């Protein structure tokens, strides 16, 4: 019996086989989940292609969090397909180039606003889309990167992750009475398409494995996927508002 047998789960953020969201989707499917994916903008066709590597008939919905109407459309499409939904993965993040790479003091508000809406507010948008169908409770899990410290080059995306963490706590508060949990997985660096677009990402690669007491491989997304699938399952019924660090222990170490 799989951890997610009989579960219906919406997965955002699948672009390529290297995506963390793909690793989660693949493992969730192997653990028995029925899936729907979402994609957005120019990446939608890429998501559709990658979805075929999971299943030939996997539905892919358009969900651009910059468009309010997409939230309503996703909710309607899910209601047409399923009478309930059990879980959702938030793997949505983006920042314009000007918001990354050591340009913190010069980034204009318009670019910050785009990063904030796509990377943080989108968790609320996802909740709006899925919670009407979480009639028997459910689990929302988001991918995070530790926002307790300032990282080289991460800049406004780090601020967005701090906002994401706070958003998750408030969703946990307001959705808890409906038995809907909201948690984040703060992953160590994994070599994905998104990660490679962050200036200085290789600095994380160089030091993480040496400092993490359990070690760390930037080429192993499955350790992150396992945590996400566990949180999507029924095995954490009393856990919400949590940030689960899956980073080899790096976050707990001093200099």
Model regions: which residues?
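A glycine/serine/threonine-rich, flexible loop-to-helix segment
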Residues: 177, 189-213, 253-255
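Hydrophobic structural elements of the Rossmann-like NAD(P)H-binding subdomain
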Residues: 11, 89, 141, 182-185, ...
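Conserved mid-core segment of classical short-chain dehydrogenase/reductases
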Residues: 55, 61-72, 76-81, 87-113, ...
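Canonical Rossmann dinucleotide-binding motif of NAD(H)/NADP(H)-dependent dehydrogenases/reductases
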Residues: 2-37
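Catalytic loop of short-chain dehydrogenase/reductase
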Residues: 13-22, 93-132, 136-177, 189-191, ...
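Short coil/turn segments at alpha/beta junctions that flank glycine-rich nucleotide-binding fingerprints
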Residues: 31, 81, 133-137, 177-180, ...
């Amino acid at each position: 019996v799989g951890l997610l047998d009989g579960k219906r789960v919406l997965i955002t953020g699948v672009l390529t086989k290297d995506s963390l969201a793909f690793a989660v989707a693949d493992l969730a499917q192997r653990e028995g989940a029925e899936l729907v994916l979402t994609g957005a903008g120019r990446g939608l066709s890429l998501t559709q292609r990658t979805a075929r590597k999971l299943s030939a008939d996997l539905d892919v919905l358009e969900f651009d969090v910059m468009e309010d109407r997409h939230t309503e459309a996703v909710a309607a499409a899910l209601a047409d397909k399923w009478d309930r939904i059990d879980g959702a993965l938030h793997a949505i993040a983006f920042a314009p180039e000007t918001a990354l790479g050591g340009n913190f003091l010069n980034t204009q508000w318009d670019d910050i606003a785009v990063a904030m809406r796509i990377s943080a507010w989108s968790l609320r948008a996802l909740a709006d889309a899925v919670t009407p169908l979480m009639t028997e409770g459910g689990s929302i899990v988001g991918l995070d990167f530790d926002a307790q410290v300032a990282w080289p080059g991460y800049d406004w995306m780090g601020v967005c992750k701090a906002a994401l963490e706070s958003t998750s706590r408030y969703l946990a508060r307001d959705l808890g009475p409906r038995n809907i949990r909201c948690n984040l997985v703060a992953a160590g660096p994994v070599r994905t398409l998104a990660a490679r677009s962050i200036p200085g990402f290789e600095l994380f690669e160089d030091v993480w494995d040496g400092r993490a007491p359990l070690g760390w491989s930037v080429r192993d997304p499955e350790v992150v996927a396992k945590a996400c699938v566990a949180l999507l399952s029924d095995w954490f019924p009393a856990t919400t508002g949590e940030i689960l660090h899956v980073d080899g222990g790096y976050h707990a170490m001093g200099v």
